[in-house]
From Swiss-Prot:
Keywords noted in UniProt: Amino-acid biosynthesis, Aminotransferase, Histidine biosynthesis, Pyridoxal phosphate, Transferase
Listed name of the protein: Histidinol-phosphate aminotransferase
Species per Swiss-Prot/TrEMBL record: Escherichia coli (strain ATCC 8739 / DSM 1576 / NBRC 3972 / NCIMB 8545 / WDCM 00012 / Crooks)
The organism's place on the tree of life at top rank: Bacteria
Keyword Amino-acid biosynthesis annotated: yes
SUPFAM superfamilies according to UniProt: PLP-dependent transferases
Amino acid sequence: MSTVTITDLARENVRNLTPYQSARRLGGNGDVWLNANEYPTAVEFQLTQQTLNRYPECQPKAMIENYAQYAGVKPEQVLVSRGADEGIELLIRAFCEPGKDAILYCPPTYGMYSVSAETIGVECRTVPTLDNWQLDLQGISDKLDGVKVVYVCSPNNPTGQLINPQDFRTLLELTRGKAIVVADEAYIEFCPQASLAGWLAEYPHLAILRTLSKAFALAGLRCGFTLANEEVINLLMKVIAPYPLSTPVADIAAQALSPQGIVAMRERVTQIIAEREYLIAALKEIPCVEQVFDSETNYILARFKASSAVFKSLWDQGIILRDQNKQPSLSGCLRITVGTREESQRVIDALRAEQV
């Protein structure tokens, strides 16, 4: 009788893979959820498309046109996918040969770049950021041989700061003719002046990731975009699933990207930024908080005394934050999503009560 298990039949890299620990996967029984950088309240939409008996468009035209207009690019420079996470994976599948090519990213940063590469069997190279969380361009240059895709998150998750645009330009020159540079702009709505969308004409190897999960308040929709030149988009179209977006998703996304939807999104951003500044000011006055870092996003990174104890104490009170202790250079750090004023007050009151 065979002793081979089902797990033995799996690919070796999958057997050894640690899955991405999303906020939902980590669980918790809270009523103040400040661990996934979501918008704190639901936005209502009504479905207008009832043709659920038919397969959806592969790339829904109305939605693509709306997003292109919003982002300031041409429709042929836009690809829509199941969240920006699918865009991360599509770029690896289109440009990296498993067992031969590599991706490169700069921790501390978003965890899905490595998970996507490892799932596909592509090598991951890391160049930790400098002390100010900016790019180590010399370190990147030293490791570029064999790298096909470089991921840079700006503003960076979880640190919250923008990458210096001059460093981005240097990176794009270093990689010209060698690799695709991916600017992950999931949080760009909170600092739109910093977008690289206007650089696409200058850099044919630039790709930009976007999402409706943050400022558009549609994390449950799973809808993201890749902005790139048409040559890149055409390659991604070869590896994307035939029907990546369901009809209801495309319907709601098109509404969110209407002129009224854009106005509503910008009002949400204004409100979140005001709440962020309130929370930052309060955190700076709390004894257990050692340092509060500047943020260009809808979350705040802070360093705490006895951060693990603080994290657990708030968890036990139903306040769920994101522990960043295991990330390089983030010892003692917790990430706090900016929520409602009531949620901010719950966090402030709980932290003030900490005896550490």
